[in-house]
Amino acid sequence: MDVTIQHPWFKRTLGPFYPSRLFDQFFGEGLFEYDLLPFLSSTISPYYRQSLFRTVLDSGISEVRSDRDKFVIFLDVKHFSPEDLTVKVQDDFVEIHGKHNERQDDHGYISREFHRRYRLPSNVDQSALSCSLSADGMLTFSGPKIQTGLDATHERAIPVAREEKPSSAPSS
């Protein structure tokens, strides 16, 4: 038996103060009444569903880990192929850019683009950076740490390698 979970009354009555999913990065997946009429949220059916209850990995949020031995970035890019991704290091920043042209999906035509920029710790060995894309669409960018930082005043492209196994990133 399917039971729809109603959101708490205090979240429904906040109206325009409660974030809409209208500008989420999941374009083409359809909108709910709340997305178009947030000021009427308390009068709309209490059985609508909001995007804030999606899983972390489904939301495209990245995870950055920096421990004593290495620096790692996990980024969900399941809608992109390795050819759609560009990863480069410029000065002490890593820039990840993804773009695919318009293509058809279940809801019509869609094109996507994102740009993420992360500061590299000064003690990351920039000559040993690597980047891979798992079969489930998790991009993993990593680099070992060294005792003293290298001079990071140049730009260098980092190739994206495809892995056949799913990512080992946590699903939070």
Swiss-Prot record:
The modification N-acetylmethionine is found at M1. Residues 52-163 form the sHSP domain. Zn(2+) 3 binds at H154. Residues 1-63 are annotated as: Required for complex formation with BFSP1 and BFSP2. Keywords: Acetylation, Chaperone, Cytoplasm, Eye lens protein, Glycoprotein, Metal-binding, Methylation, Nucleus, Phosphoprotein, Zinc. Glycans are attached at S168. Disulfide bonds: none annotated. One of its GO terms (molecular function) is unfolded protein binding. GO terms for biological process: actin filament organization; apoptotic process involved in morphogenesis; embryonic camera-type eye morphogenesis; lens development in camera-type eye; lens fiber cell morphogenesis; microtubule-based process; mitochondrion organization; negative regulation of apoptotic process. Zn(2+) 2 binds at H107. CDD domains: ACD_alphaA-crystallin_HspB4. The modification Deamidated glutamine is found at Q6, Q50, Q90, Q147. The modification N6-acetyllysine is found at K70, K99. PANTHER family: ALPHA-CRYSTALLIN A CHAIN, HEAT SHOCK PROTEIN HSP-12.2-RELATED. Contributes to the transparency and refractive index of the lens. Acts as a chaperone, preventing aggregation of various proteins under a wide range of stress conditions. Required for the correct formation of lens intermediate filaments as part of a complex composed of BFSP1, BFSP2 and CRYAA. Belongs to the small heat shock protein (HSP20) family. This is Alpha-crystallin A chain. The gene is CRYAA.
